[in-house]
């Protein structure tokens, strides 16, 4: 009985994420990275002239300011960028 209980506890620890970790897409959306602590936003950066082609994607802690040439889109759910 103790072995079964210990097994259930270990499976729970392995399967559950102890502390939420955000996952953001890298430049190629097939790949993603787990964001470090404090980085609670995913972002996508692209040039205003070519909005369909992202230049950079990743994790960030604050919403960056867009400019006339560069636009940022941020979100806070897994792989939303």
Swiss-Prot record:
Concerning PTM, the database record says: This toxin lacks one of the four disulfide bonds found in similar cardiotoxins.
Q: Does the keyword Signal apply?
A: yes
Q: List the disulfide bonds.
A: 24-42, 35-59, 75-80
Please provide, alphabetically and separated by semicolons, the GO molecular function terms listed in this UniProt record: toxin activity
Q: Is Membrane one of the keywords?
A: yes
- Tell me where in or outside the cell this protein is found: Secreted; Target cell membrane
Query: An example of a Gene Ontology BP annotation on this entry?
Result: killing of cells of another organism
Q: Which GO terms describe its cellular component?
A: extracellular region; membrane; other organism cell membrane
Q: In which tissues is it expressed?
A: Expressed by the venom gland.
Q: Which residues form the signal peptide?
A: 1-21
Note the Pfam families from the entry.
Toxin_cobra-type
Q: Which superkingdom?
A: Eukaryota
Mind listing the UniProt keywords for this protein, alphabetically?
A: Cardiotoxin, Cytolysis, Disulfide bond, Membrane, Secreted, Signal, Target cell membrane, Target membrane, Toxin
How does this chain assemble?
Monomer in solution; Homodimer and oligomer in the presence of negatively charged lipids forming a pore with a size ranging between 20 and 30 Angstroms.
Q: What is the stated purpose of this protein?
A: Shows cytolytic activity on many different cells by forming pore in lipid membranes. In vivo, increases heart rate or kills the animal by cardiac arrest. In addition, it binds to heparin with high affinity, interacts with Kv channel-interacting protein 1 (KCNIP1) in a calcium-independent manner, and binds to integrin alpha-V/beta-3 (ITGAV/ITGB3) with moderate affinity.
- Name used for this protein in its record: Cytotoxin 2c
Origin species, per record, is Naja sputatrix
Upper classification of the source organism reads:
Eukaryota, Metazoa, Chordata, Craniata, Vertebrata
